Design a protein with these regions (language model features):
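Conserved P-loop NTPase-based nucleic-acid remodeling module centered on helicase motor cores
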Residues: 2-101, 248
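Short, glycine/charged-enriched secondary-structure capping and boundary segments
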Residues: 2-5, 29-33, 213-216, 241-245, ...
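Conserved helicase NTPase motor core
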Residues: 15, 44-45, 140-249, 263-267, ...
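Non-catalytic, well-ordered alpha-helical scaffold segments
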Residues: 17-24, 47, 70-81, 100-104, ...
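ATPase/helicase motor core of nucleic-acid motors
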Residues: 21, 224, 252-253
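Inter-lobe coupling/hinge region of RecA-like P-loop helicase motors
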Residues: 35-38, 256-263
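Conserved ATP-driven helicase/translocase motor core recognized via long
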Residues: 57, 78-157, 161, 165
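Helix-loop-helix "sensor" segment of P-loop NTPases
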Residues: 254-255, 272
Length: 274
């Protein structure tokens, strides 16, 4: 559409799309993910996990409770990847996939094994969950804690299977696109990738912290122009990990260059009043 309206060679260099689309385009063009790879959605994730758990796929899809339990494992897989990639804590997509009960039980486990609960310990637990689960056979182990840990280790097993299945079949979900792009743009070879001196982001309140970090990473450090467009009222609904704190951060960053639009020019007044 841009090329059909702007007859300039520079039009070919303009990218228009959401953050996920940019990440997908970037990862394929830079051969960070193989050309034969496929992008999967939530339904595909349910299909993968229902096969592993030997549950009827349609039954899972139509059951909100089962869907939530499945996606808690998908989210845990992303959490594990981010932990292994040393992503800053504030950029984690699903920090709440590790519940307060999980933390309490893991602290108890570490106390029994005389080790400290840290990020590196968590990575080791994720990589060797079956070995750690053997500790639950100790008859002196607290029953309540053992029950919590069995539930946790089951989720870890499912999350690890999901990650392994994707790797073996060259599959990537939408969160993989974000995490891999962030890794690439924060790696030692980041200067080899294209950066943009002019960036415009619409619906910025819908961006989560990782998406915003990607926008920052692809923007040139010098002589840049960045425009953020958003609706503060919509931000209160916290969509897809986005929070009001995103706009608060941008307010501080853009202090002195913030403009409020109060007139709606996209709809007639009688429609707005309905």
């Amino acid at each position: 559409r841009i090329q059909s309206n702007i007859d300039l060679p520079q039009a070919l260099e303009v990218f228009v799309g959401n953050v996920h689309r940019y990440c997908s385009k970037f990862l394929f063009e830079e051969n960070i993910i193989p050309a034969g790879s496929s992008i999967i959605d939530d339904d595909d994730a349910i299909s993968i996990l229902s096969g592993y758990l030997e549950e009827e796929e349609q039954g899972v899809s139509s059951n909100p409770t089962l869907r939530r339990s499945y996606f808690s494992c998908v989210q845990l897989a992303a959490f594990i990847f981010q932990l292994k990639s040393n992503h800053p804590k504030e950029l984690r997509l699903h920090p709440d996939c590790i519940t307060a009960d999980d933390v309490t039980a893991l602290r108890y486990l570490c106390q029994q094994l005389h080790i400290e609960l840290s990020a590196s310990t968590m990575v080791d637990i994720f990589d060797h969950s079956k070995r750690y689960a053997d500790a639950l056979d100790n008859p002196l182990f607290d029953y309540g804690m053992a029950k919590l840990l069995k539930s946790f280790f089951k989720r870890v097993d499912i999350a690890n299977y999901y990650a392994s299945y994707k790797d073996e079949n060259q599959l990537y979900d939408f969160e993989d696109l974000l995490m891999l792009t962030y890794n690439a743009y924060t790696s030692p070879s980041a200067n080899e990738y294209r950066h943009y001196s002019w960036v415009q982001i619409d619906e910025v309140q819908d961006l989560n912290a990782l998406q915003l970090a990607i926008v920052d990473a692809i923007t040139t450090k010098e002589q840049r122009s960045v425009v953020y467009l958003g609706d503060e009222q919509q931000a209160i609904f916290s969509f897809m990990g986005a929070k009001l704190s995103t706009l608060s951060l941008l307010k501080e960053r853009c202090k002195g260059h913030i403009y409020h639009l109060h007139t709606n020019h996209r709809a007639p007044s009688y429609l707005v009043k309905v």
